[in-house]
C-alpha cells in the first residue's frame, strides 16, 4: 500500500517540499539560514499575535499599553522581548542568507532571487512600522524622519507624505495605519515565502561547488531536517540569552521616554539592522540624492545577476573574489557602525568613503576582478 503522505493532496505538497525533496548532498551550514528565517517568521507571528491582544493603537494609550504588557500580562515582558530581539535575529539570518546567495552565486536562480529581494524589502517595511508602535521618543522621531524622506520626490512628494501621515504630522492616524499594516504584512510575507520556495523547488538548490547537483542528491528528511533542527537550537541559545539577560542591549534608551513632538532627541537613529542604509543616506548632503542612494543600496541586489562576469558560479575556487566579498562584508559593518554615530567628523568622511566603496565594489571592482580570474584560468 502506498504511503498516505505520497497520495493525499495536502500531505503530498508537504512531502515533496520537506520530506522526499531531492537535496544536494554537499550543502553546508550556510544553507541552514533559510529554515532559520522560517522559524524566525513563525516566532514573530506568534509573539506578535499575543502582543496585539493587549496593545492599543492610540497615541494616548500606546506607550502605557506596552508598559502594561511588560508589567501585568503573564510573561508579557518575555513575549515583548522575544518579539523585539526576534526581529534582530531575523535580520541577522536575512543578511547571512543574502550574503550566502552572493558568495555561492545563488542569484543565477533569477526568479527565486527577485522574490527574495521583494521579501527583504517587505520585511524591512514591516520592521520599520513595528518600531513605531511602542510610541516612544525614537519611535515617533524615527517615523517622522523616515516618512519625511518621501518629500524629496519631485512634485508629488509633500502630498505623498501627508497622505501617509493621514494629517499634517505623525499622529493618531499614522499610528493606527502603521499597526494595521504591521499586522497584515507578516501574512503577506508568508505568502511570498511560499512563492520563494515554489521557484526554488522548480530549479533545485545551488551547492557550494556551483556545479550541477543532479548526479548526487539525498532526501531532505532525515538528513537536513536534523541539520536544521540543530541550527534552530543554536539560534535559540543566543536569542534566549538576549531576552533573559540583556533584553535592551539592541534597543534605544530614548524609547523608554513617551513620544513628545516638542522635544527632539539629540541623535535620531533606527534599529541596528537599518544603520548601514541610514549611513549611506546621511553620507550624501543632498536630500533627493540621499534617498536615491538609500533605495539603490538595497535594489542594487536586483542587478547583480547582470553584473556576473565570472565563468564559475560559486566563489569557492576564486580567491580574489573571496577577498573582495569579505571586504564588502567589512564595509557593511563599518557603515552599520557609522550609522549609529553623530553627524560630525571623522564619522562623516568615514561614512562617505564606506558608501563609495560599497557601490564601487558591487558595480565595478568585483565584476572586473571576476574577468581577471577568467583570464588567469585561461577561460
Swiss-Prot record:
Other known facts: Heme 1 (or BL or b562) is low-potential and absorbs at about 562 nm, and heme 2 (or BH or b566) is high-potential and absorbs at about 566 nm.
CDD domains named in the record: cytochrome_b_C, Cytochrome_b_N
GO cellular component: mitochondrial inner membrane; respiratory chain complex III
Residues that, per the record, bind heme b b562: 83, 182
This protein's UniProt keywords: Electron transport, Heme, Iron, Membrane, Metal-binding, Mitochondrion, Mitochondrion inner membrane, Respiratory chain, Transmembrane, Transmembrane helix, Transport, Ubiquinone
Gene3D superfamilies: Cytochrome Bc1 Complex, Chain C
Pfam families linked: Cytochrom_B_C, Cytochrome_B
Binding positions (heme b b566): 97, 196
Gene: MT-CYB
Positions that bind a ubiquinone: 201
Family of the protein in this entry: Belongs to the cytochrome b family.
Superkingdom of origin: Eukaryota
Functional note: Component of the ubiquinol-cytochrome c reductase complex (complex III or cytochrome b-c1 complex) that is part of the mitochondrial respiratory chain. The b-c1 complex mediates electron transfer from ubiquinol to cytochrome c. Contributes to the generation of a proton gradient across the mitochondrial membrane that is then used for ATP synthesis.
Protein's membrane topology: Multi-pass membrane protein
Protein's UniProt keywords contain Protein biosynthesis: no
Cofactor(s) for this UniProt protein: heme b
UniProt subunit comment: The cytochrome bc1 complex contains 11 subunits: 3 respiratory subunits (MT-CYB, CYC1 and UQCRFS1), 2 core proteins (UQCRC1 and UQCRC2) and 6 low-molecular weight proteins (UQCRH/QCR6, UQCRB/QCR7, UQCRQ/QCR8, UQCR10/QCR9, UQCR11/QCR10 and a cleavage product of UQCRFS1). This cytochrome bc1 complex then forms a dimer.
GO BP term, example: mitochondrial electron transport, ubiquinol to cytochrome c
UniProt main location, coarse: mitochondrion
Name of the protein this chain belongs to: Cytochrome b
Membrane-spanning ranges: 33-53, 77-98, 113-133, 178-198, 226-246, 288-308, 320-340, 347-367
Localization terms from the record: Mitochondrion inner membrane
Cofactor note: Binds 2 heme b groups non-covalently.
Gene Ontology molecular-function annotations: metal ion binding; ubiquinol-cytochrome-c reductase activity
Amino acid at each position: 500500500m502506498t504511503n498516505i503522505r505520497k497520495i493525499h493532496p495536502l500531505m503530498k505538497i508537504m512531502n515533496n517540499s520537506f520530506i522526499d525533496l531531492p537535496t544536494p548532498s554537499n550543502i553546508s551550514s550556510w544553507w541552514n539560514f533559510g529554515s532559520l528565517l522560517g522559524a524566525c517568521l513563525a516566532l514573530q507571528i506568534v509573539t506578535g499575535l499575543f502582543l496585539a491582544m493587549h496593545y492599543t493603537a492610540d497615541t494616548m494609550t500606546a506607550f502605557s499599553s506596552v508598559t502594561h504588557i511588560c508589567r501585568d500580562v503573564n510573561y508579557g515582558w518575555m513575549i515583548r522581548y522575544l518579539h523585539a530581539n526576534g526581529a534582530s535575529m531575523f535580520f541577522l539570518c536575512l543578511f547571512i542568507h543574502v550574503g550566502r546567495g552572493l558568495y555561492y552565486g545563488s542569484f543565477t536562480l533569477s526568479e527565486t532571487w527577485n522574490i527574495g529581494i521583494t521579501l527583504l524589502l517587505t520585511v524591512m517595511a514591516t520592521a520599520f512600522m513595528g518600531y513605531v508602535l511602542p510610541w516612544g521618543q525614537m519611535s515617533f522621531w524615527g517615523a517622522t524622519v523616515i516618512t519625511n524622506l518621501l518629500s524629496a520626490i519631485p512634485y508629488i512628494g509633500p502630498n505623498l507624505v501627508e497622505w501617509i501621515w493621514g494629517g499634517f504630522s505623525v499622529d493618531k492616524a499614522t499610528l493606527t495605519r502603521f499597526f494595521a499594516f504591521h499586522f497584515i504584512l507578516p501574512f503577506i510575507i508568508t505568502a511570498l515565502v511560499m512563492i520563494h520556495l515554489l521557484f526554488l523547488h522548480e530549479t533545485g538548490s545551488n551547492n557550494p561547488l556551483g556545479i550541477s547537483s543532479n548526479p548526487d542528491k539525498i532526501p531532505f528528511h532525515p538528513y537536513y531536517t536534523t541539520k536544521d533542527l540543530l541550527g534552530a537550537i543554536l539560534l535559540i541559545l543566543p536569542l534566549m540569552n538576549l531576552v533573559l539577560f540583556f533584553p535592551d542591549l539592541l534597543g534605544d534608551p530614548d524609547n523608554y521616554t513617551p513620544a513628545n513632538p516638542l522635544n527632539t532627541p539629540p541623535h535620531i537613529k533606527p534599529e541596528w539592522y537599518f544603520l548601514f542604509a541610514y549611513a549611506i543616506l546621511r553620507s550624501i548632503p543632498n536630500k533627493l540624492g540621499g534617498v536615491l542612494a538609500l533605495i539603490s543600496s538595497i535594489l542594487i541586489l536586483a542587478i547583480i545577476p547582470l553584473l556576473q562576469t565570472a565563468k564559475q558560479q560559486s566563489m569557492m575556487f576564486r580567491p580574489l573574489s573571496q577577498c573582495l566579498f569579505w571586504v564588502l562584508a567589512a564595509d557593511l559593518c563599518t557603515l552599520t557602525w557609522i550609522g549609529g554615530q553623530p553627524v560630525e567628523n571623522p564619522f562623516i568622511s568615514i561614512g562617505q568613503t564606506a558608501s563609495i566603496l560599497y557601490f564601487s565594489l558591487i558595480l565595478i571592482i568585483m565584476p572586473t576582478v571576476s574577468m581577471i580570474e577568467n583570464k588567469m584560468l585561461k577561460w
